[in-house]
From Swiss-Prot:
Coiled-coil regions, chain positions: 92-137
Membrane topology: Single-pass membrane protein
Function: Part of the tripartite efflux system MacAB-TolC. MacA stimulates the ATPase activity of MacB by promoting the closed ATP-bound state of MacB, increases the capacity of MacB to bind macrolides such as erythromycin, and provides a physical link between MacB and TolC. Confers resistance against macrolides.
Bilayer-crossing regions: 11-31
Organism placement in taxonomy: Bacteria, Pseudomonadati, Pseudomonadota, Gammaproteobacteria, Enterobacterales
Cell compartments where the protein resides: Cell inner membrane
Family that this chain belongs to: Belongs to the membrane fusion protein (MFP) (TC 8.A.1) family.
InterPro entries in UniProt: CusB_D23 (IPR032317), MacA_alpha-hairpin_sf (IPR030190), RND_pump_MFP (IPR006143)
GO MF, any single term: efflux transmembrane transporter activity
Protein name, UniProt field: Macrolide export protein MacA
Coarse class of the protein's main subcellular location: membrane
Organism of this sequence: Escherichia coli O157:H7
Length: 371
């Protein structure tokens, strides 16, 4: 009886083992085949750029000030007006400068009259001295009288020298007064557009220490872009690199130029250090305006017709610029070592290790997802 139970128990165990084996085999045979997201390696172009935010300014901008004090009697322009070089912009009350000219001219007339009188007196003194010399030879006059005549002649000569010096000084004052009269006319130092008016008509300007600003002119035909670049990126920049930008109102239009310079003085913004890279762009249609925000791209590298793969295809690093990548062949994956070159935020150049047509694994597809 015991023997029969033992045999039956063995049959049950064997049956369980067989069933478990069959289940395992079924699972293996019906397990989903792993699928991968892949990409065929092909030649292409690769660009590496620095992204930055910038502001637009006019390449040439000048503050037009007053060099004399007085009331701004006339202001002939308004904000937005386009002016030509030497065009009259405004007039400061010229009365004070005109009165100064009249005063100096009157002083000069008086000095010239004094000089004529002094010349006549000098002529008389010379005649008197000559007469005294002849009389002294016959001892008709004393030597003291002769010395007195000589002194009188020298005094008259010195008076003429003093008057000449006063005439020169007043002539310089007259030239200054005429210049100040010219300064009452505010003219445009260059062609451009009036972008700001600081002093209104009727206001009084005082030019005692520094020239007060009347208005600001900007030449909008060429714009200057100041791109704010982080300290991590600025070390890669140099003059001559290609740069382009778009503006918020027209993101499809690219405005292109070349880096002009990188300002050496940084700016600190919320404990972050930034430098300014500048470049110029033409603005023939006047679409670009002051203080517009620019989305700037500065091109660091531009390689043509090279093999590239996505950065996501790179595996573990194995050395300087060397990585492992997975290739898919006949449904099986294998690793290969590659050497990389230029890279940007999405792709990388393959210098060595892959050929055009190779299929690289960039990820594993989820069950039920298409390759």
């Amino acid at each position: 009886m015991k023997k029969r139970k033992t045999v039956k128990k063995r049959y049950v165990i064997a049956l369980v083992i067989v069933i478990a084996g069959l289940i395992t085999l079924w699972r293996i045979l019906n397990a989903p085949v792993p699928t991968y997201q892949t990409l065929i390696v092909r030649p292409g172009d690769l660009q590496q750029s620095v992204l930055a935010t910038g502001k637009l300014d006019a390449l040439r901008k000048v503050d037009v000030g007053a060099q004399v004090s007085g009331q701004l009697k006339t202001l002939s322009v308004a904000i937005g007006d386009k002016v030509k070089k030497d065009q009259l912009l405004g007039v400061i009350d010229p009365e004070q400068a005109e009165n100064q000219i009249k005063e100096v001219e009157a002083t000069l007339m008086e000095l010239r009259a004094q000089r004529q009188q002094a010349e006549a007196e000098l002529k008389l003194a010379r005649v008197t001295y000559s007469r005294q010399q002849r009389l002294a030879q016959t001892q008709a006059v004393s030597l003291q009288d002769l010395d007195t005549a000589a002194t009188e002649m020298a005094v008259k000569q010195a008076q003429i020298g003093t008057i000449d010096a006063q005439i020169k000084r007043n002539q310089a004052s007259l030239d200054t007064a005429k210049t100040n009269l010219d300064y009452t006319r505010i003219v445009a130092p260059m062609a451009g557009e009036v972008t700001q008016i600081t002093t209104l008509q009727g206001q009084t300007v005082i030019a005692a220490q520094q020239a007060p600003n009347i208005l600001t002119l900007a030449d909008m035909s060429t714009m200057l872009v100041k791109a704010q670049v982080s300290e991590a990126d600025v070390i890669h920049l140099k003059p001559g690199q290609k740069a382009w930008f778009t503006v918020l109102g027209d993101p499809l239009t690219r405005y292109e130029g070349q880096i002009k310079d990188v300002l050496p003085t940084p700016e600190k913004v919320n404990d972050a250090i930034f430098y300014y890279a500048r470049f110029e762009v033409p603005n023939p249609n006047g679409l670009l305006r002051l203080d517009m925000t620019a989305q700037v791209h500065i091109q660091l590298t531009d390689v043509k017709n090279v093999l590239t793969i996505p950065l996501s295809a790179l595996g573990d690093p194995v050395g300087d610029n060397r990585y492992k990548v997975k290739l898919l062949r006949n449904g099986e994956t294998r690793e290969r070592e590659v050497t990389i070159g230029a890279r940007n935020d999405t792709d990388v150049e393959i210098v060595k290790g892959l050929e055009a047509g190779d299929e690289v694994v960039i990820g594993e597809a989820k069950p039920g997802a298409a390759q």
